[in-house]
């Protein structure tokens, strides 16, 4: 008989219960026992489905990705350690030296810096276009174009891409169309329904929804099977692995996604209407407003009444007034990120888009004094009162 020390390491695990748990289990294992050498070889080559090593695949992360896949109406999904891990793996999987990618100026700051920094050093060129105008995209596509990239709603301008129109252009050109749908989520808009090939999320935001877990996910339809295979291989090579505890928390957040997003969107629209009528406010960016670039697109593409849970408020008085308003907030905390249960506030020109110069900010639709307000689940009246008292400080009568 083996020694007690050895027995402590080799005691068989109990079998999984026959009863089904309504809560997904968490598997912390980094490695998995196999039947024989051929079994492991088949797992690593992809000839056989299963698990071998946690950097390759993990059942807890896969369960989360599969849930997002179903919400998006996709056929394939891959989990990642963060939204930027998902974005960078997608771009590096599809782009090589000499290739071009078509993208809008209104991009998340780190996506823009990835395109103009790392990918530029690798020999990839960005061709800028207006993704709300399919003709602009068509004019930007060349024989070297290997990817068209967009955001469903841009951070923080809330500009939208014409998903069906651009998808049609990409289909004719034979170019993959990928969108970052972080700001919308499948509780508001499902890009695959509009002809998009790949949908990317920072799951840290609305999918998780509680500001306590970091992750990302890429979803593709059946026609994108080969693209998803390349993205998975790049994830394995780069190591952007979603940890099991993070995957569990993100998966749990999906259960309340529809409730949270519906409430936050309704509150954001209410705040946008009230602030747009305030004489102390120069501009409010929110697709529910008739004056916003994305108003018609939002009504055509989004679920009814769900036109975004983020608004940007620019008080009269420029950058100084914006910062004064931000510092005067009492209920709403200053913090980065979005999509959680708490309403937050930040100054994009000095945070998420700090790497852009004045011209770059203007092209991205960001005003120097703009304050981004990702709306949470607080009562609208309480949020409005805080914003109005902060406006009174920033723009005195």
Which sequence ranges carry the predicted segments?
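N-terminal glycine-rich, Lys/His-bearing helix-loop that initiates the first secondary-structure elements
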Residues: 1-48, 396-397
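PLP-dependent enzyme catalytic core of the Aspartate aminotransferase-like
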Residues: 2, 116-117, 125, 139, ...
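Glycine-rich beta-alpha junction loops
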Residues: 13-15, 28-34, 183, 205, ...
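Conserved PLP-enzyme active-site core in the AAT-like
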Residues: 14-17, 76-280, 285
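Conserved N-terminal alpha-helix of the aminotransferase class I/II PLP-enzyme fold
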Residues: 31-88, 110-117
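Short, acidic Gly/Pro/Ser/Thr-rich loop/turn segments
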Residues: 33-37, 225-226, 257, 318-321, ...
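Short amphipathic alpha-helical segments
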Residues: 49, 75, 214, 246, ...
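Conserved C-terminal alpha-helix-loop-beta "cap" of PLP-dependent enzymes
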Residues: 281-371, 375
């Amino acid at each position: 008989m083996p020694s007690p020390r050895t027995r402590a390491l080799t005691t068989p695990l109990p079998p999984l219960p026959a009863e089904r748990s309504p809560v997904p289990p968490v598997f912390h294992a980094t490695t998995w026992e196999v039947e024989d050498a051929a079994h492991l070889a088949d797992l690593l080559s992809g000839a056989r489905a299963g698990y071998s090593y946690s950097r390759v695949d993990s059942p807890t992360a896969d369960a989360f990705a599969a849930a997002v896949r179903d919400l998006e109406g996709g056929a394939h999904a891959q989990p990642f350690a963060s939204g930027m891990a998902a974005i960078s793996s997608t771009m590096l999987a599809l782009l090589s030296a000499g290739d071009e990618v078509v993208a809008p100026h209104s991009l998340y700051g780190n996506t823009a810096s990835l395109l103009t920094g790392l990918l530029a050093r690798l020999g990839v060129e960005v061709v800028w276009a207006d993704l709300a105008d399919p003709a602009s995209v068509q004019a930007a596509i060349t024989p070297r174009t290997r990817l068209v990239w967009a955001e469903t709603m841009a951070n923080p301008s809330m500009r939208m891409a014409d998903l069906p129109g651009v998808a049609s252009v990409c289909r004719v050109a034979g170019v993959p169309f990928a969108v970052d749908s972080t700001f919308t989520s499948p509780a508001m808009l499902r890009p695959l329904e509009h002809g998009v090939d790949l949908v990317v999320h920072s799951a840290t935001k609305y999918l998780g929804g509680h500001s306590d877990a970091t992750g990302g996910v890429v979803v593709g339809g059946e026609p994108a099977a080969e693209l998803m295979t390349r993205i998975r291989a790049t994830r394995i090579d780069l190591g952007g692995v979603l940890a099991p505890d993070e995957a569990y928390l993100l998966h749990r957040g999906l259960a309340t996604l529809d409730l949270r997003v519906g409430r936050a969107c309704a509150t954001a629209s209410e705040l946008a209407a009230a602030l747009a009528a305030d004489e102390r406010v120069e501009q409010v960016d929110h697709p529910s407003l008739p004056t916003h670039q994305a108003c018609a697109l939002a009504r055509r593409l989004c679920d009814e009444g769900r036109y975004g849970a983020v608004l940007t408020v620019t008080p009269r008085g420029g950058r100084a007034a914006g910062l004064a308003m931000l510092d005067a907030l009492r209920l709403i905390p200053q913090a980065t990120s979005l999509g959680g249960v708490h309403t937050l506030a930040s100054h994009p020109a000095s945070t998420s888009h700090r790497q852009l110069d004045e011209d770059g900010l203007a092209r991205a639709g960001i005003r120097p004094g703009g304050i981004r307000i990702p709306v949470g689940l607080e009562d609208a009246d309480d949020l409005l009162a805080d914003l109005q008292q902060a406006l009174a400080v920033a723009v005195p009568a």
